[in-house]
Amino acid sequence: AYCMEKVEDDFMEVAPTDPKDVVRFVKEVPYWTAQKHGKKYRLMYQVYTLPKYIEHGKKFFEGVNERYTEYAKRLEPKIGIPYTVITPLIFIFVRACVHYAMFEDEYYLQTQMEVLKQGVALFADKYKANQA
């Protein structure tokens, strides 16, 4: 579990808290995490999908769900999108980053990033209109 926690801590250390930094973060982090964590992700997935260790993996990811939801709650007032919408967007982003780090699948990464960009723009417009 330490390895998984370390990777997540590294990821959260560079996570933006300023909306102006989100675009840079989204562009850079998939490549950064592939270089820094690719081997660790592959090892972790091998270990935590084994029947012997699956419960440890489930427990870790329960905590991930809580931590990412808390991060989304901190972003909500800054970007004006409810945390209940931000949280699944974070999950999609992280999944795309992990997939890229493990397999260096540029097509998968870019298609996920494109839908995230469009989704965030649509949600931002929707919630700005609701506030007006």
Describe every region a protein language model picked out.
Residues 32, 50-51, 93-96:
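A short structural micro-motif
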